[in-house]
Amino acid sequence: MTLISRCSMTIEETLQIALDAHRGQKDLDGRPALLHPIAVGLMGSNDTEIMTGFLHDVVEDTALTLEDLRGKGVEEDVLAALQLLTHDDGQNYFEYVRGIAESGNITAIHVKTNDLRHNLERGLKTYARAEEQGDTAMMERLARINDKHRKALHLLSCRCGTQSV
């Protein structure tokens, strides 16, 4: 008889953690912050990438810690990727991205790539709305953010041999 091991946590359970953790948060464009991790999760190519995508902003943007997530039953491979994906404010952003690229953790690399692609897509749309409204301050802010995301995506793709946007 062959035993099939069941993951300790389902995609639905990780989505619920993200829903609860991001409740009430808004993004720069005024939309619910949760829409971004959902989009990043849906870009995943396997269950681990989907779960990591759903949770990728939880430690960075909410009160939950990696230990809290471990206590909720999040798998160790997801936690390892989340540790790499959590940016410490004291660390240079591009060093952080370089660390992900050089880690060899395929889940973290794929999720960060998906994160950057989605952030850039959102940023370009929000920039267009700001331009239509004549909001030059928002346009300048978004131009800097979009440029940072382009550079990070390029850095990640060059280090990992993936295709850039």
Name every feature range the model reports, one short phrase each.
Residues 2-165:
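Active-site helical microenvironments for divalent-metal-assisted chemistry
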